[in-house]
């Protein structure tokens, strides 16, 4: 999965049950390079530990061996393709499911999504970078993995740092409102995961989202005029107590992904 390195699979499992759902099956499709494992004991041990951790969290590990071939231009390519296995498993297992959560950005799954929906399944999508726009339109809900609290740890966060959403913590969100001339805007971030992920209006008390004001001087990356607001640009920022009111303020704002 592009952009998802370091993902916390225990957090992913919790997210899959965000509306008190019961897990029926957790499939993890992993690539394994047999040739590299034979030559590199550290790689082999690391993969075994990773697979064991997945099983500890309740995932069924489906291993796909890396295959090497040379293309028409003479370029050596290593690839482990699990798309077909994933599609077949979803179709076969969907008879006993109310909802399917997919982690992929591959547009080849559009027809699979339609087939699942025609069977009465709700299909939700979590992805990071290089996400097919057609796949995003087809699913019942799409959420960038960057925005799920603690799914992808904040790089460089010190030990003992405030928890996601607390004052002094660093979170990820999107800019949903911005005034170019005045030079300010508002970020929205997911504060908690629950059954009401559709309630994005932070004025509602039951919304799992929160808003943080920001001034353009806190933007660490250059953005062209009119480039924000844009929900396809993921920002990472520090949360501070606002000096203007009792709300939140975003500082040290950095672009971490563009979908």
Residue ranges: model-predicted function:
Residues 240-259:
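OB-fold/S1-family single-stranded nucleic acid-binding modules
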Residues 1-82, 107, 122-130, 229, ...:
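Domain-level signal for Mg2+-assisted phosphodiester chemistry and nucleotide/NA-binding surfaces
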Residues 194-218, 249-251:
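A short macromolecule-binding patch
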Residues 81, 96-133:
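Active-site histidine-anchored catalytic micro-motif
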Residues 166-181:
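Structural detector for short beta-strands of small beta-barrel domains
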Residues 180-201:
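Short aromatic-glycine-enriched beta-strand elements
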Residues 137-167:
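C-terminal helix of von Willebrand factor
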Residues 218-236:
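Short nucleic-acid-contacting surface segments enriched for D/E, G, S/T with interspersed K/R
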């Amino acid at each position: 999965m592009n952009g998802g390195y370091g993902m916390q699979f225990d957090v992913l499992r919790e997210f899959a049950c965000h509306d008190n759902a019961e897990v029926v099956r957790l499939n993890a499709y992993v690539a394994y390079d047999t040739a590299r494992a034979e030559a590199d004991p550290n790689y082999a041990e690391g993969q075994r530990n990773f697979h064991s951790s997945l099983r500890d969290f309740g995932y069924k590990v489906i291993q796909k061996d890396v295959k090497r071939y040379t293309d028409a231009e003479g370029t050596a390519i290593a690839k482990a393709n699990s798309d077909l296995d994933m599609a077949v498993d979803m179709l076969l297992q969907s008879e006993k499911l109310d909802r399917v959560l997919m982690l992929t950005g591959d547009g080849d799954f559009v027809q699979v999504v339609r087939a699942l929906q025609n069977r009465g399944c709700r299909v939700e999508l979590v992805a990071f970078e290089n996400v097919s726009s057609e796949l995003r339109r087809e699913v019942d809900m799409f959420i960038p993995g960057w925005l799920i609290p603690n799914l992808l740890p904040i790089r460089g966060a010190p030990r003992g740092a405030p928890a996601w959403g607390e004052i002094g913590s660093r979170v990820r969100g999107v800019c949903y409102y911005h005034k170019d001339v005045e030079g300010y805007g508002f970020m929205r971030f997911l504060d908690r995961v629950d059954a009401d992920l559709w309630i994005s209006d932070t004025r509602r008390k039951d919304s799992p989202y929160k808003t943080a004001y920001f001034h353009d001087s806190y933007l660490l990356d250059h953005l062209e005029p009119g480039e924000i607001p844009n929900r396809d640009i993921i920002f990472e920022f520090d949360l501070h107590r606002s000096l203007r009111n009792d709300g939140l303020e975003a500082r040290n704002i950095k672009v971490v992904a563009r979908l």
